[in-house]
């Protein structure tokens, strides 16, 4: 496996996929596990991921995709619709704490779980009161998206993060409102085909343009 810096230098956003090439199932499982394990603020995990690979699944989501992005969906091996919560109940957040206890996060100090639980809920309620809860949870989905992109690249799998979509239509298709969810983006996955974008040198602003030391 390549080191992370090499992957960062080589990864690019794929424009065209080879529809004949499919991602091995074991690799798909690994990528979905990376999504599940992605970090989030106070471990709140305010997300849900819909995964598709069949023509039936693609046809389902295509009405939410504008013409210029349809080839990405049509020819990819798999796609993931990343969604974030628009609301989280106390019961949902308590479940997170229960899973943490079950996973052995507090073996020596079980009483900590109550403090962690109350702090997590307070943090979520703070964002509700600030009126930016939906934006906050969407930011967490972007963290998961980044993990997915680089995990895919580490396996030689190409990807495209897509914001060019009809979010309201996607919400309707997947019945997200009733699930207290909102669509945030789609990531397509597969293998490149005749993609001139892959031949262009990577271009970013210089180190000094974006990095500034406070030391």
Place the predicted regions along the sequence by residue.
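Acidic, surface-exposed loops and disordered segments
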Residues: 1-215
């Amino acid at each position: 496996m390549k080191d992370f810096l090499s992957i960062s230098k080589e990864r690019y956003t794929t424009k065209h996929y080879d529809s004949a090439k499919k991602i091995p199932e074991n690799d798909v499982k690994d990528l979905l596990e990376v999504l599940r394990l992605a970090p989030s603020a106070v471990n709140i995990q305010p997300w849900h991921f819909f995964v598709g690979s069949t023509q039936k699944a693609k046809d389902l989501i295509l009405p939410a995709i504008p013409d210029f992005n349809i080839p990405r969906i049509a020819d990819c091996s798999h796609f993931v619709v990343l969604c974030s919560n628009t609301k989280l109940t106390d019961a949902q957040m308590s479940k997170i704490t229960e899973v943490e206890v079950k996973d052995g996060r507090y073996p020596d100090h079980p009483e900590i779980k109550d403090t962690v639980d109350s702090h997590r809920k307070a943090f979520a309620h703070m964002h509700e009161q600030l009126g930016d809860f939906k934006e906050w949870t969407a930011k967490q989905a972007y963290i998961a998206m980044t993990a997915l992109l680089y995990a895919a690249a580490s396996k030689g799998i190409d990807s495209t993060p897509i914001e060019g979509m009809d979010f309201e239509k996607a919400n309707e298709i997947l019945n997200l409102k009733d699930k207290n969810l909102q669509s945030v983006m789609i990531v397509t996955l597969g293998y490149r085909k005749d993609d001139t974008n892959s031949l262009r040198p990577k271009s970013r602003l210089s180190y000094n343009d974006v990095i500034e030391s406070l030391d």
